[in-house]
């Protein structure tokens, strides 16, 4: 209601000035062009008049595109906030009632579990240095296992060569013992045991 009265008063004050400016003839050529509208509201031809929509259709289209409840001008919003909404009393201090908190009873065994976790953490303190040491040890072991797998045939060949050398040395020691005992040759049906070359 208040907004309707205010807008009607503003329209009354603005309309006479608009009529005066339109009715006042301009002096000279410059004045006539100053108050002459740059466009014409009347259609130029009957075909153009038939193509243009009516005022009712245009207003319905505007209401459909921009509803009146959503289209609020800044003036209307300011007037609504200034006169219709209740004002806040600054002098009266606002006191907020403290909310009541209720402590729920603990569950059975929860305190014991928490105590056990605390004791475990206290017994085995975890440090960044210890974690890095463990990770480095695991990585070194992993690299060593990969190296062993990659060089297993080469190491087998080296090991077999060492065993052959040990077997030859063992046979030489046996021959030296025979000669020292007074035997020129080994006894009949004697086979030198293959101690180091078990698979051969």
Curated annotation (Swiss-Prot):
One GO CC annotation: mitochondrial small ribosomal subunit
One GO BP annotation of this record: positive regulation of proteolysis
Principal location class: mitochondrion
Localization terms from the record: Mitochondrion matrix; Nucleus
Coiled coil, from the record: none
Tissue expression from the record: Ubiquitously expressed and especially highly expressed in heart, skeletal muscle and testis.
Record bears the keyword Protease: no
Keywords, sorted A to Z: Mitochondrion, Nucleus, Ribonucleoprotein, Ribosomal protein
Function: May act as a negative regulator of Aurora-A kinase, by down-regulation through proteasome-dependent degradation.
Protein family membership: Belongs to the mitochondrion-specific ribosomal protein mS38 family.
UniProt subunit comment: Component of the mitochondrial ribosome small subunit (28S) which comprises a 12S rRNA and about 30 distinct proteins. Interacts with Aurora-A.
UniProt protein name: Small ribosomal subunit protein mS38
Protein's organism: Mus musculus (Mouse)
